[in-house]
């Protein structure tokens, strides 16, 4: 086992601290994934199309009601409240479409595909394109090279990036606006587009699926353009555009926090050290306060990553049942108040210090570029 821990002071967390606590999160777990599966109650695996559709109905009704109320009152005092609320619901709709992509929505593939296309196209997400890349993320979670979402940059790639690109990636809130760019261009060091049927993201057999989803996405975009001419662009921006930006910020923040920002530095793997189980155990549960229910318990992320076929409405029970097997490999999330303000601190702190991982070693930890913000500060002084 090779652990890349050069320049120890630049590594988030300290191996000495882990040894003092008697626990190393990068050590082989003493249990197998079958042990976790056996601990989860049978009812947690049952999918109910009616129950899943009830959440879709709830969210669509809430989105429509909010939009009608905002247009009716048309008050600049209320618009900011509407934007936050509606953007939050757009994120909830995304989560339901995400469930369709995993097949946890129902055991009926056609229903999953139809509902998934409707939900994701509405918020300008190419359903199959994202579904397939997200499947890659789950199949390779925690792998430095093969993971798909918020992948750590190897040191050589990081240091070859223009300084402006590094600043864009590691200056809050800019990373929280990355999702549309990711859909078109993926992450640094990776090629392909979620809209192109011939992208390296997809197998030849998946090209028709990608074309279908890109067509649905295009229809939604054309509808928004048409409404801009039919009504006026400012109204479309207020009713849809700003909530879309809030949704993107929710998506980027939540997906980042599920894989970064824990108080204890967590490992990433390569080569023979990686396994599906070890990669899944590097994910993090989060408590989103009042948003837990609104966002369909997306914060129960560890069990979701290991068993994505479990419906979201059973994830709390499944997590509770699996904790005794996971032991210290499960990191109990900090209890949130009504509004999860504490997560903002975790997000900002992680982005400021989790910059790259070593080019070598099968178990690596994030390291910090001590000159990233110093360079920017010195340059501003010169100017």
From Swiss-Prot:
Keyword Transmembrane helix: yes
Placement of sequence motif Histidine box-3: 301-305
Pathway: Lipid metabolism; polyunsaturated fatty acid biosynthesis
Any Pfam family matching the protein: DUF3474
Reactions listed under catalytic activity: a (9Z,12Z)-octadecadienoyl-containing glycerolipid + 2 Fe(II)-[cytochrome b5] + O2 + 2 H(+) = (9Z,12Z,15Z)-octadecatrienoyl-containing glycerolipid + 2 Fe(III)-[cytochrome b5] + 2 H2O
EC number(s) recorded for this UniProt protein: 1.14.19.25
Motif placement: Histidine box-2: 134-138
Annotated transmembrane regions: 53-73, 210-230, 234-254
Keywords in alphabetical order: Endoplasmic reticulum, Fatty acid biosynthesis, Fatty acid metabolism, Lipid biosynthesis, Lipid metabolism, Membrane, Oxidoreductase, Transmembrane, Transmembrane helix
GO biological processes: unsaturated fatty acid biosynthetic process
Motif Histidine box-1: where in chain: 98-102
GO cellular component labels: endoplasmic reticulum membrane
InterPro entries according to UniProt: FA_desaturase_dom, FAS_N, Fatty_acid_desaturase
Keyword Mitochondrion listed: no
Membrane topology: Multi-pass membrane protein
Localization per record: Endoplasmic reticulum membrane
Disordered: region residues: 1-28
Chief site of localization: endoplasmic reticulum
Gene Ontology terms for molecular function: acyl-lipid omega-3 desaturase (cytochrome b5) activity
Family statement: Belongs to the fatty acid desaturase type 1 family.
Domain observations: The histidine box domains may contain the active site and/or be involved in metal ion binding.
Free-text function comment from the UniProt entry: ER (microsomal) omega-3 fatty acid desaturase introduces the third double bond in the biosynthesis of 18:3 fatty acids, important constituents of plant membranes. It is thought to use cytochrome b5 as an electron donor and to act on fatty acids esterified to phosphatidylcholine and, possibly, other phospholipids.
Protein name: Acyl-lipid omega-3 desaturase (cytochrome b5), endoplasmic reticulum
Species of origin: Brassica napus
Gene from which this protein is expressed: FAD3
